[in-house]
């Protein structure tokens, strides 16, 4: 993970740690002219590592976004932001996207009253995301919510009730709330 964030910059979904600035000798050696290919590859890798996708999954999302009407890049980011694991991360119910994936895989999360164990589940507007009524599930989420530093900067397409361990998807995300800087 640290090699990835050192090479690509801060990836908030992958880890909460930040790369050190200026002290990296390798970056000074690699600071030549960047080709278009290198820029596109780095941006693609940022997407992959931030959202925790394989190459094949990313290609499927690009294909779906290409078929839809509108800007392919904006639609791609909207599709990725509406994944269940990413929404849990944005709500503050998990500290990272891999942590959110683990919560979903271990069946701690309900969407509209049903257990969902697929992290790539695409959430829709008016979906209600809750935890299981088990004590262990609620304790896990409570620890994440209590320790999450970005409670006040919740995107406007999401609302959370931290006392009932419940989140609500209000609408599809706006482009200004997407947390990753992509060229």
Curated annotation (Swiss-Prot):
Supply the PROSITE patterns for this chain: RIBOSOMAL_S4 (PS00632), S4 (PS50889)
CDD domains in the record: S4
**Source superkingdom:** Eukaryota
Q: Which UniProt keywords apply?
A: Chloroplast, Plastid, Ribonucleoprotein, Ribosomal protein, RNA-binding, rRNA-binding
Q: Which GO terms describe its molecular function?
A: rRNA binding; structural constituent of ribosome
* Listed Pfam families: Ribosomal_S4, S4
The record's note on quaternary structure and interaction partners says: Part of the 30S ribosomal subunit. Contacts protein S5. The interaction surface between S4 and S5 is involved in control of translational fidelity.
Q: Record's family?
A: Belongs to the universal ribosomal protein uS4 family.
Its recorded name reads Small ribosomal subunit protein uS4c
Q: Which organism is it from?
A: Babiana stricta (Baboon flower)
The record lists the lineage as:
Eukaryota, Viridiplantae, Streptophyta, Embryophyta, Tracheophyta
């Amino acid at each position: 993970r640290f090699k990835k964030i050192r090479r690509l910059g801060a990836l908030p979904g992958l880890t909460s740690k930040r790369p050190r600035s200026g002290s990296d000798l390798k970056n000074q050696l690699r600071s030549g002219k960047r080709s278009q290919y290198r820029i596109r590859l780095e941006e693609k890798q940022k997407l992959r590592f931030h959202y925790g996708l394989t190459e094949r999954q990313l290609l499927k999302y690009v294909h779906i976004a290409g078929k839809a009407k509108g800007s392919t890049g904006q639609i791609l980011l909207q599709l990725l932001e509406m994944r269940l694991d990413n929404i849990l991360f944005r709500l503050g119910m998990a500290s990272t996207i891999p942590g959110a994936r683990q919560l979903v895989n271990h069946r701690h999360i309900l969407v509209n009253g049903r257990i969902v164990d697929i992290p790539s589940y695409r959430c829709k507007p008016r979906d209600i995301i809750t935890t299981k009524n088990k004590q262990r599930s609620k304790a896990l989420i409570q620890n994440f919510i209590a320790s999450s530093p970005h409670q006040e900067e919740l995107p406007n397409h999401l609302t959370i009730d931290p006392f009932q361990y419940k989140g609500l998807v209000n609408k599809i995300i706006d482009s200004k709330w997407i947390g990753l800087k992509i060229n």
